[in-house]
């Protein structure tokens, strides 16, 4: 059976947030997945940022598994206090952690992120 476009059915629109300051600018678009995908994915995120210097973020623990598809220079990922656990990655999947991780970018990046549930990422990558 072919799927028909129904004018009565509406999908939630993406929410776009923009910020500009002396340090640079960024834009973030977020949207929920279709209802049928919500047991497997929590959110879609798109971003673009340009800042004047390298930027280091503290990513807090989560019960999700983000898939990051980066269109810019690779990110530098490392565990706090352990420089031996360091990676340079353009695109990657993270897992659930019990502590924060540090992610450094060179100042300009853009990409897409899908925040999967743990079940969703297990089904995707096995």
Language-model features: locations:
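Alpha-helical bundle regulatory/interaction domains
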Residues: 2-126
């Amino acid at each position: 059976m072919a799927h028909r476009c129904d004018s009565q059915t509406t999908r939630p629109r993406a929410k776009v947030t923009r910020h500009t300051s002396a340090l640079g600018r960024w834009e973030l678009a977020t949207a929920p997945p279709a209802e049928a995908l919500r047991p497997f994915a929590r959110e879609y995120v798109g971003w673009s940022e340009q800042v004047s210097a390298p930027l280091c973020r503290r990513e807090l623990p989560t019960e999700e598994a983000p898939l990051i598809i980066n269109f810019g220079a690779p990110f530098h990922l490392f565990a706090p206090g352990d420089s031996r656990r360091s990676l340079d990655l353009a695109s990657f999947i993270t897992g659930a952690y019990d502590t924060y991780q540090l992610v450094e970018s060179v100042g300009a990046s853009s990409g897409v992120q899908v925040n999967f549930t743990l079940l969703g990422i297990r089904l995707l990558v096995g």
